[in-house]
From Swiss-Prot:
The keyword Cytoplasm applies. Residues 1-81, 113-211, 760-796 are annotated as: Disordered. This is Pre-mRNA-splicing ATP-dependent RNA helicase prp28. It comes from Aspergillus fumigatus (strain ATCC MYA-4609 / CBS 101355 / FGSC A1100 / Af293). Signal peptide: none annotated.
Length: 796
């Protein structure tokens, strides 16, 4: 500064002498060589040769530029705006252009990047002083006490170049503050692939998704882990933090002791029959009685009469109230109080199902049937206490002049269900014996039955009602001469009961005409078709007059329209509905109502079915002897066989056991058949041995046991066989001997036993191979029946 002032020109540079060189410490001597090392060569003391003369002269030494704060700097000129914009555009254009990198360059960049990451990770791993201590083992300066002015002073640790390559974390004055930044997180491990980190994360996500799917598939097929302690059924303990526990009881409430509103209830007194809403019938009865007493006290004569009327009105109101009617059973209600729900329950109780237009409701009792009083008296005299399900449903429909198809199990009272409407129909017609020409025009009604025995049985049942009413009933069956039957028809007959074959013979011989027939009943229609009577049935129905045939329109479902004109009425009863029966029904019936009791083809629920696997005639005879001698079953008993030549043999065996027996098959004459049935019905014979001839329609009262010595060829025949017992609501037992030759019906038999609530399927039948699936060839006949004595021919 003194030199600058003395020269008088403070801006001129002043040349100062160079500073004296600092004395460096002497270099330590080199370490002594090892013994095994070779000695160094001696120093070269020779003088170097002079430079050659032809060498060019050395350039003059370049003048050393002054470096430092005193050096002259060029004047900085500011950049113009145009220059800045141009540079910016050039930089953007260069950045927008794709930069090509060769494979070697990409590998080099990746290796350098990987090397830096490895080096950073190694430094972070080898640095043990991240908890506040420096590398020399001393405590970090950040833990020293603060200075009085609030700053933390750090002790210098040497030049920056000698601080073990520490990364600066900010200005030196703020480097040891408490709000210093935390060290950066360690970098993620990367593979030596040439792809970027996005590919690795995508691959990792795909692997995680695949692992999750594999876990779900394993859980689906292997189930949940058994070590899991979770249980859906385990009761969870509820928290009690929201449950308020009262510290007093309801008995401690003293508000009712001193408040008169709680001590006595206010009663609103109404003079009249009015009352407050919301009270039960007991309160209404009390108010009505109170009002009646008030009327009696006011006026002894007129008031007492009025009081009785009010009490009677209240009683009727209580009985007819909706709430009371809903609580009552249908048997306790009046007919006008029956609702749709009650009728539905009623049909379910009796297993009744109806379809076919507007079908009337069933009748609950004989009094509600709509029959004339004279017929109701006859019903009571005959002994019909309660109507059967088919009678409950069929009689109201038939009384409306509707065509009817009744599908019901055997022994369900079908005879009375069509006889009673028939008698009502013909009772409104003129008497047939009034004029001679009316006798010759034929009957008013015909009843077709498949067998002679069934026809005669229907005749016996019909005479119980026709004789008191003055109607004539004639049966036309085989086994009797035409002259005898013609003599029976000399005075005419309102009702003719016949088999199809004999009735066709009478029509062809001109013994009978159907000019005024207006009521047709086909009983056991499926059995008639099964016996080959389809063609005779068609001939009979085609011989009927067409003048009174119903129209095949919706008017056939209108009961009022049918009653206004005397149309022909057709009824068909069957236990099953094969295709041939359906074909006849579609051809000759007009918009029929269909009534089904139970299910078509089912056995009666009152019959207990037992099946025993017994092979061989001798074993079966021995088992039959044990059953008859057990005393469990009282006569009469029916034993069914498949072929007629076995009937006499089984009957002889039964007689040797000490029981009386008769036979019934196709080789018997009509007189022999009638005598056999009469002996069984009057109790003079214990056992009836028969073929399928007696399987349908034969009503022997109080049959306690049916034995199928040979299993029937079809499940339908089996159903009608066992239907000979358990009739009219009574219970019965059916025992069947089964063998391997009955494989065709084992499956259907097992299904029928499973549907029966009181029957059991034996293990031999349940596990039999033929009972596992339905045979493909259908209901084929067995080879035993192909010897000329067929079960469905006239040779039974």
């Amino acid at each position: 500064m003194d030199g600058i002032i003395s020269n008088g020109s403070p801006g001129a540079p002043v040349t100062q002498p160079p500073p004296e060189p600092l004395e460096r410490p002497p270099t330590p001597p080199p370490p002594p060589p090892e013994d095994s090392a070779a000695p160094p060569p001696p120093p070269d003391t020779s003088v170097p040769p002079p430079p050659p003369e032809d060498a060019p002269p050395a350039p003059p030494p370049e003048k050393k530029k002054k470096v430092g704060w005193g050096a002259k700097r060029p004047a900085a000129t500011p950049l113009s705006v145009e220059e800045l914009v141009r540079k910016k555009r050039e930089a953007d254009a260069a950045a927008a252009k794709p930069k090509f990198l060769s494979k070697a360059e990409r590998e080099r960049i990746a290796l350098e990047k990987r090397a830096k990451e490895v080096e950073a990770g190694r430094r972070l791993k080898l640095d043990p002083f991240t908890d506040g201590t420096d590398r020399s083992g001393t405590q970090s300066p950040s833990v020293y006490p603060e200075t009085p002015n609030g700053d933390e002073r750090s002790i210098p640790t040497g030049p920056r170049a000698m601080r073990n390559s520490e990364v600066p974390t900010g200005p030196a004055a703020m480097r040891n503050k408490t709000y210093d930044m935390s060290p950066p997180p360690p970098p993620k491990a990367m593979s030596f692939s040439l792809t970027d980190g996005k590919g690795d994360s995508k691959r990792q996500a795909e692997e995680d998704e695949a692992a999750a799917q594999a876990a779900l598939i394993k859980q689906k097929y292997m189930g949940t882990e058994k070590t899991s302690s979770f249980s859906a059924k385990k009761k969870r303990k509820r928290t009690t933090d929201r449950k308020f526990n009262f510290e007093w009881n309801a008995e401690e409430d003293t508000s009712g002791d001193y408040n008169p509103l709680y001590q006595q209830r206010h009663e609103a007194n109404f003079y009249g029959r009015g009352r407050l809403a919301g009270f039960g019938d007991d309160v209404a009865d009390t108010l009505a009685q109170k009002y009646a007493r008030a009327l009696e006290d006011r006026d002894r004569e007129a008031g007492s009469i009025r009081a009785r009327e009010i009490l009677e009105m209240e009683r009727r109101r209580r009985e007819e109230s909706t709430r009371n009617q809903l609580d009552k059973h249908w048997s306790e209600k009046k007919l006008e109080h029956m609702r749709e729900r009650d009728w539905r329950i009623f049909k379910e109780d009796f297993n009744i199902s109806t379809k076919g237009g507007s079908v009337p409701n069933p009748m609950r009792s004989w009094e509600e049937s709509g029959l004339p009083k004279r017929l109701l008296e006859l019903v009571d005299q005959v002994g019909y206490k309660e109507p059967t399900p088919i009678q409950r449903a069929a009689i109201p429909i038939a009384l409306q002049s509707r065509d009817l198809i009744g599908v019901a199990v055997t022994g369900s009272g079908k005879t009375a269900s069509f006889l009673l409407p028939l008698l009502v129909y013909i009772s409104e017609l003129p008497r047939i014996d009034e004029f001679e020409w009316r006798k010759n025009d034929g009957p008013y009604a015909i009843v077709l039955a498949p067998t002679r025995e069934l026809a005669q049985q229907i005749e016996i049942e019909a005479r119980k009602f026709t004789q008191p009413l003055g109607f004539n009933v004639v049966s036309i069956v085989g086994g009797h001469s035409f002259e005898e039957q013609a003599y029976s028809l000399r005075n005419g007959a309102e009702i003719i009961i016949a088999t199809p074959g004999r009735l066709v013979d009478c029509i062809e011989r001109r013994l009978l005409v159907l000019s005024q027939c207006c009521y047709v009943i086909m009983d056991e229609a499926d059995r008639m078709i099964d016996l080959g009577f389809e063609e005779p049935v068609n001939k009979i129905l085609d011989a009927l007059p067409v003048t009174n045939e119903k129209p095949d329109t919706e008017e056939a479902e209108n009961s009022a329209a049918m009653r206004s004109h005397r149309y022909r009425q057709t009824m068909m009863y069957t236990a099953t509905m094969p295709s041939a029966v359906e074909r006849i029904a579609r051809k000759y019936l007009r918009r029929p109502a269909i009534v089904t009791i139970g299910s078509a083809g089912e056995a009666v629920d009152t019959v207990e079915q037992r099946v025993e696997m017994i092979a061989g005639e001798d074993k079966r005879k021995k088992r039959l002897a044990d059953i008859l001698s057990s005393g469990e079953f009282r006569p009469p008993i029916i034993v069914f066989v498949n072929i007629k030549r076995n009937c006499d043999a089984i009957a002889r065996e039964i007689k040797q056991m000490g029981f009386s027996s008769v036979t019934l098959h196709g080789s018997k004459t009509q007189e022999q058949r009638e005598a056999a049935l009469a002996s069984v019905r009057n109790g003079s014979t214990d056992v009836l041995v028969a073929t399928d001839l007696a399987g349908r329609g034969i009503d022997v009262p109080d049959v306690s046991l049916v034995v199928n010595f040979n299993m029937a060829n079809s499940i339908e025949s089996y159903t009608h066989r066992i239907g000979r017992t358990g009739r009219a609501g009574k219970s019965g037992v059916a025992i069947t001997f089964l063998g391997n030759e009955d494989a065709d019906v084992m499956y259907d038999l097992k299904q029928m036993l499973m549907k029966s609530p009181i029957s059991r399927v034996p293990e031999e039948l349940r596990k039999h191979e033929a009972a596992q699936s339905k045979p493909n060839r259908g209901l084929a006949k067995k080879s035993d029946d192909s010897s000329g004595f067929g079960t469905k021919s006239g040779w039974q």
